């Protein structure tokens, strides 16, 4: 089995967007997710979901969670993904938040 560590970061918008998708013929372990409010004076709300391709379903694991200005919300427990599964994120408004994740891809 070949393992590859990957990082992915994006600027969040008010539209749910796919941040990461597990490639075909691989499995992924999301080691950590960092959701950061990059403003100094605006509260932001963030949502995160996992799309399970085999179930044809999005599962919300975070829904409109408050992130104070200059703060970071961290998921530090693993999220296991099968081939084609994805992580989706959105914020309450554009230009308020960034998201970063650390992934181990296993083939």
Ranges and model annotations:
Residues 1-28, 32, 90-107:
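C-terminal interaction-tip segments
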Residues 27-29, 41-45, 57, 96-97:
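Short acidic/proline- and small/hydrophobic-mixed sequence motifs that coincide with surface turns
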Residues 29-34, 47, 72-74:
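Ordered hydrophobic segments in well-structured contexts
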Residues 35-41, 92:
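Short solvent-exposed strand-capping/beta-turn motif centered on an Asx-Ser/Thr pair
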Residues 46-48, 87-89:
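Hydrophobic beta-strand residues in large extracellular and virion-surface proteins
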Residues 47-51, 100-102:
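Beta-strand signatures of extracellular beta-sandwich domains
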Residues 51-55, 106-107:
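Short edge-strand/loop segments of extracellular domains
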Residues 53-86:
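Intrinsically disordered, low-complexity Pro/Gly/Ser/Thr-rich segments with frequent PxxP/GP/PP motifs
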């Amino acid at each position: 089995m070949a393992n590859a560590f990957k990082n992915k970061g994006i600027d969040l918008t008010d539209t749910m967007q796919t941040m990461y998708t597990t490639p075909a013929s691989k499995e992924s372990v999301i080691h950590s997710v960092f959701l950061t409010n990059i403003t100094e004076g605006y509260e932001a709300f963030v949502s995160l979901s996992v799309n399970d391709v085999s179930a044809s379903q999005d599962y919300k694991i975070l829904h409109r969670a408050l992130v104070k200005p200059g703060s970071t919300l961290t998921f530090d427990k693993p999220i296991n993904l099968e081939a084609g599964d994805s992580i989706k994120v959105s914020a309450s408004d554009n230009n308020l938040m960034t998201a970063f994740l650390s992934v181990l891809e296993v083939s």
